[in-house]
């Protein structure tokens, strides 16, 4: 029974550590070459994970639910993304800045979020 409790405590400790990881909002291009940009965003999220942090990439989530070709849906997705950005500890920007990314950068500055900019990382 002692070993079982030890394993349980270790699992609980790991869950708490995972839950308390810093959250990083990943800002990168989506529109245009969607397939290439999606693959790049996935790569950037993996980069964040390798740094021991939790990536939040709204542009990998909301296009699955909303139609990015409909202006109202696109605006809603951007608004949801900015709301998620507010929950994050930092904002990391990857590659050239698009119009949507510029709005994310402005929101990060408004909220005094630490902002890190990267060239395209190993895509």
Positions of the model-derived regions?
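Catalytic phosphate/metal-binding cores of nucleic-acid and nucleotide-processing enzymes, i.e., regions
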Residues: 1-123
């Amino acid at each position: 029974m002692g070993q079982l409790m030890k394993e349980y405590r270790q699992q609980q400790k790991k869950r708490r550590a995972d839950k308390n990881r810093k959250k990083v909002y990943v800002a990168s291009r989506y529109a245009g070459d969607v397939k290439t940009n999606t693959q790049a965003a996935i790569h950037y999220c993996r980069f964040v994970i390798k740094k021991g942090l939790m990536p939040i990439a709204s542009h990998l989530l909301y296009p699955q639910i909303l139609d990015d070709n409909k202006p109202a849906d696109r605006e809603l997705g951007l608004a949801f993304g900015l709301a998620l950005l507010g929950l994050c500890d930092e904002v990391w920007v990857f590659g050239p800045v698009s119009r949507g990314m510029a709005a994310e950068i402005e929101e990060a500055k408004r909220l005094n979020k630490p902002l890190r900019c990267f060239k395209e990382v190993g895509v």
